Curated annotation (Swiss-Prot):
PANTHER family: CTP SYNTHASE, CTP SYNTHASE-RELATED. This is CTP synthase. HAMAP family: PyrG (MF_01227). CTPSs have evolved a hybrid strategy for distinguishing between UTP and CTP. The overlapping regions of the product feedback inhibitory and substrate sites recognize a common feature in both compounds, the triphosphate moiety. To differentiate isosteric substrate and product pyrimidine rings, an additional pocket far from the expected kinase/ligase catalytic site, specifically recognizes the cytosine and ribose portions of the product inhibitor. The keyword Electron transport does not apply. Keywords: ATP-binding, Glutamine amidotransferase, Ligase, Magnesium, Metal-binding, Nucleotide-binding, Pyrimidine biosynthesis.
């Protein structure tokens, strides 16, 4: 039977439940179990697609086109699996389904209520994933215990403990802060969060204490006394040098052994050698490479978390230390001299939408192109690379994307045909995996080592086919195209040290154990240029 591990959080949000969930799943996977993870989000949005990145962080796109919570990215990166959009359950989805069912007469005249109809819908969605054949399903319940919107999900989890014959474990994650004045750990907030959990009928089996530094045995004893959780089932996730070390420190404390004992499952000895080597490579590297990330949401780093992690994955395999420089494209518009002051080794032009900060991104693209600095553009970053090239190389000074200037005389970027008749925002973009053909002999071909790939997408606009010929005749290489429609998927320059931009999002396929080749190539080029060598991809000198 499938085991279910529910992860709850106390005291405040953003305490690290997502990493704890991914770590627990990884600990079980390291013992030979097949494991998947689910994120429950109690908000009423159907998905994360239309939410402000400053409120929600990155929208993580799944292979099947789901616009999901960024925690699904952590799950995929830790487990090296592909999750579907069904692995992100929101209140909006649940209530929409229940109300639709009531309208269609599914409930045969019953009075439709939170219990049992909403809770049954929640349980059905969790069990549908379990039926795929997993040994264990780890479910992170978003938000904080005590939030009104979380109550139906906690109630559904409580019911599942009754119904699943001992195959359910509850793990509670909560912080124990340190007062600066006394340098003392304070456990009272955690104690109260467990009291809130008990009020809804849930006694946690395991507690993970989040702290800035390792807790003392006295703290563990005090938490045990007031939460009714034995000391050997209390673990500490303290701040470490990389999130990929968290499963290692929790397993060293015995979490894997105790969890499998509670679930009464037979497992193998954990295999951590490859993971440990990569983590050590990540934290012990000394050669530094500076990568500038240029976009408009840089004040909240979580808005681009998959790109940051993809850089770290590639750096770990190359045994270098990435230094990430954040570049606010709006600030570049005010002061273009910021670009040379950064003295960077490589640029990534970040994805995004809208007019704000666009000219700053275009300035950064031009600076990288004219100064032979390695550049990778992603999604909007590719579209604006085309705009910059059309303006500066083709001489089409009014060239733009119709997303920003619908009246431009040279719409080198225009809305895709399939998007023109759509008048809703949510879930209507070109989303998820698409099959792509790579141009034989291109730089991209050498990087991938393949002529046919699949990558994830999230966009409405495309390179305007009316400008294909002009752009190509001016030296812009279309190195990848969609298989099913005439759509540019990647561009590159052969007279530049390293200049590649993609319509797709390579960051969503990067893993610590399997970094994405585009990020590895960017860092290789940046390192070679830093050492004064010819480009390993074009032969161009620095």
């Amino acid at each position: 039977m499938t085991a279910f591990i529910f992860i709850t959080g106390g005291v405040m949000s953003s305490v690290g439940k997502g990493i704890a969930t991914a770590s627990i799943a990884k600990i079980l996977q390291a013992r030979g179990l097949s494991v998947t993870a689910i994120k429950v989000d109690p908000y009423l949005n159907v998905d994360a697609g239309t939410m402000n990145p400053y409120q929600h962080g990155e929208v993580y796109v799944t292979a099947d086109g789901g616009e999901t919570d960024l925690d699904l990215g952590h799950y995929e990166r830790f487990l090296d699996v592909e999750l579907s959009k069904s692995h992100n359950i929101t209140s909006g989805q649940v209530y929409l389904s229940v109300i639709d069912g009531e309208r269609r007469g599914v409930y045969l005249g019953q009075t439709v209520q939170l219990i049992p109809h909403v809770t049954n819908e929640i349980k059905a969605r969790i069990r549908a994933i379990a039926k795929e054949g997993w040994d264990a399903v780890v479910i992170e319940i978003g938000g904080t215990v005590g939030d009104y919107e979380s109550l139906p999900f906690l109630e559904a989890a409580r019911q599942m403990r009754l119904e699943e014959n001992g195959n359910v474990v509850f793990v509670h994650v909560a912080p124990v802060p340190i007062l600066d004045v006394t340098d003392e750990f304070k456990t009272k907030p955690l104690q109260h969060s467990v009291m809130e959990l008990r009020r809804v009928g849930i006694q946690p089996d395991i507690i993970i204490i989040r702290s800035t530094r390792p807790i003392t045995n006295d703290v563990k004893a005090k938490v045990s006394l007031f939460t009714n959780v034995p000391q050997n089932l209390i673990f500490n996730s303290f701040n470490v040098d990389t999130i990929y070390r968290v499963p290692l420190i929790l397993d060293e404390q015995g979490l894997g052994r105790m969890l499998t004992e509670l679930l009464k499952v037979k497992v193998n000895e954990p295999k951590w050698d490859d993971w440990v080597n990569l983590v050590n490579s990540m934290v012990n590297a000394t050669d530094e490479v500076k990568v500038t990330l240029c976009g408009k949401y840089v004040k909240l780093r979580d808005a681009y978390i998959s790109i940051v992690e993809a850089i770290r994955h590639a750096a770990a395999w190359l045994r270098v230390k990435p230094r990430i420089i954040w570049c606010d494209s709006e600030e570049v518009e005010k002061d273009p001299d910021l670009l040379p002051k950064m003295n960077t080794d490589a640029y990534i032009i970040l994805p995004g939408f809208g007019a704000r900060g666009v000219e700053g991104k275009i300035m950064a693209i031009r600076y990288a192109r004219e100064n032979n600095i390695p550049l990778l553009g992603i999604c909007y970053g590719m579209q604006l690379s085309v705009v910059e090239y059309a303006r500066d190389v083709l001489g089409l000074k009014d060239a733009h994307t119709t997303e920003v200037n619908p009246n431009t005389t040279h719409p080198v970027i225009d809305i895709t045909p399939e998007e023109k008749s759509i008048n809703k925002l949510g879930g209507t973009m070109i989303l998820g995996d698409r099959e792509i053909s790579i141009t034989e002999g291109s730089i991209l071909h050498g990087i991938y080592g393949s002529l046919r790939i699949r990558e994830r997408h999230r966009h409405r606009y495309e390179v305007n086919p009316a400008y294909f010929k002009q752009l190509q005749e001016a030296g812009l290489v279309f190195s990848a195209m969609r298989i099913d429609v005439p759509r540019v998927e990647a561009i590159e320059l052969h007279n530049h040290y390293f200049f590649i931009a993609t319509q797709f999002h390579p960051e969503f396929r990067s893993r610590l154990t399997r970094p994405h080749p585009l990020f590895t190539a960017l860092l290789k080029a940046a390192l070679a240029r830093k050492m004064g060598l010819e480009s390993p991809y074009t032969g161009v000198k620095p």
